[in-house]
Amino acid sequence: MGRCLTKKVFLIQSPILFLHLLISLSSGAVKPDLKGVCVSKGGRFPPYELEGKPPKSVGRGSKDLTLCRVFRKKTCCSSVQTNPAFVAVRNLATYGEASQECLELFELLECSICNPNVGIQPGPPRICASFCDRVFEACKDAYFASNALKRVIGPCGVNDDIICIKASNWESNGTSFCEAAGFAVQRNDDSREKPCYGSKASLESVVESWSRDSRKETPLKTETLSCFKDLLQWVREMTTIQKISLGMSFLIAGMFLIRQSNNRNQKQRLAAIQRTARRLRGNGNGDSYSAAINRRTSSD
């Protein structure tokens, strides 16, 4: 693909990678010596299983997080928290008519509960007002519904079609939108006494850390990642007909490789039989046996 088509592949062109970057950038100034214990958020957020214990890493496999996995190295979350967040994002994608940017930012908002700094703070997740404004601006035309039981708004679900309206009809700005969704909002993003999720200071510190990690990558890893991004973008931009054609090409190529492998295996088996025949030439029967094998090979 001409050295992977191009080197200029931006993360924003790949929604999955862009989302992971957004989560990393908004993860707050997570420090290795983070102290404190997990405090359940109350409201619509399920209690932490680590209530009263410090945040810890989450293993992969059956105990892995169903969402927000960027925080698995240090978090108060378990699947108890990420399952509802996963459902909310899925509903927004399925019924909310949300843009890609809205989906990414709303998932980032839902994942705030898994940020270790947020986990040790009392009360609902404290979100920076500037970040709430970004989420609302991206999601104001997406459809949300009011949950009468939990007294919050959330993405429309399968049973919410009657009272499903645009976010801009529920609230008029980012602060009221976040509060209506069950979050606390902090107006001063740069407060050191009370850090909030998505502050400018935390973004800059994590960007610097992320840049250091990126420079440590080997050229081979960087090249491989670039190739993967280019291939992913190329496939996304293909039409349905082109994707079907590409799939058929892969199928035909696979069948050709299987046939080649079978032919090679058959030749290897015949060669082994011939070697055995040559070892038997010491007796009379061996010569006739070898001749028979040679005739079989010639006929094939």
Swiss-Prot record:
Domain of life of the organism encoding this protein: Eukaryota
Induction per the UniProt record: Induced by salicylic acid (SA), correlating with the accumulation of folates.
GO molecular function: folic acid binding; folic acid transmembrane transporter activity
Signal peptide coordinates: 1-28
Compartments where found: Membrane
Alphabetically ordered keywords of this record: Disulfide bond, Folate-binding, Glycoprotein, Membrane, Receptor, Signal, Transmembrane, Transmembrane helix
Disulphide-bridged cysteine pairs: 38-76, 68-111, 77-114, 102-139, 132-178
Pfam families in alphabetical order: Folate_rec
Biological processes annotated in GO: folic acid transport; response to salicylic acid
Glycosylation sites: 173
Main location: membrane
GO CC aspect terms: membrane
Membrane topology term: Single-pass type I membrane protein
Membrane-crossing segments per the record: 238-258
Tissue specificity as recorded in UniProt: Expressed in leaves.
Matching PANTHER family: FOLATE-BINDING PROTEIN 1, OS02G0592500 PROTEIN
Family listed: Belongs to the folate receptor family.
Purpose of the protein: Folic acid-binding protein involved in salicylic acid- (SA-) induced folate accumulation by triggering uptake and accumulation of folic acid in cells. May be implicated in the transport of the folates from the site of production (leaves) to the site of storage (fruits and seeds) and utilization (roots).
Protein name: Folate-binding protein 1
Organism lineage string: Eukaryota, Viridiplantae, Streptophyta, Embryophyta, Tracheophyta
